[in-house]
C-alpha cells in the first residue's frame, strides 16, 4: 500500500467522521449514505477509488455502530414495537433510497 493511497484513505475517513458529527440524526445519516452509496456504486470508478470511497468514506459516515447503538436504546427502554418498526422501515427505506441513487446515477451518465 503506497503512502498516497493510505493518506487519501485516512483523509476521506476523517472527513466522513467529521460529517457524521455534523448530522446528529442517525436516520438522516442513513438516508444520505444510502443515496450516495447507490449513486456512486453505478459509476465507473477505479478499484482503488471505490475502496477509498466505500471503505473509507461510507464506512465512517454511515457507521453501523451508531445505528446499532440507536436500536439498543430502544431495547434498554423496552420499546420493542418501536425497535421492530424502526428496524424494518430503515432497512426498506434505505434499500429504496439506494436504488433511487443508483438509477439517478445511471441516467446522468
Curated annotation (Swiss-Prot):
It catalyses: fluoride(in) = fluoride(out). The keyword Cell membrane applies. InterPro entries: FluC. Signal peptide: none annotated. Pfam families: CRCB (PF02537). It comes from the Bacteria. It is found in: Cell inner membrane. The keyword Metal-binding does not apply. Keywords: Cell inner membrane, Cell membrane, Ion channel, Ion transport, Membrane, Transmembrane, Transmembrane helix, Transport. The chain crosses the membrane at residues 21-41, 52-72, 83-103. GO terms for biological process: monoatomic ion transmembrane transport. It is a multi-pass membrane protein. One of its GO terms (cellular component) is plasma membrane. Its main location: membrane. Belongs to the fluoride channel Fluc/FEX (TC 1.A.43) family. Fluoride-specific ion channel. Important for reducing fluoride concentration in the cell, thus reducing its toxicity. This is Fluoride-specific ion channel FluC 1. It comes from Prochlorococcus marinus subsp. pastoris (strain CCMP1986 / NIES-2087 / MED4).
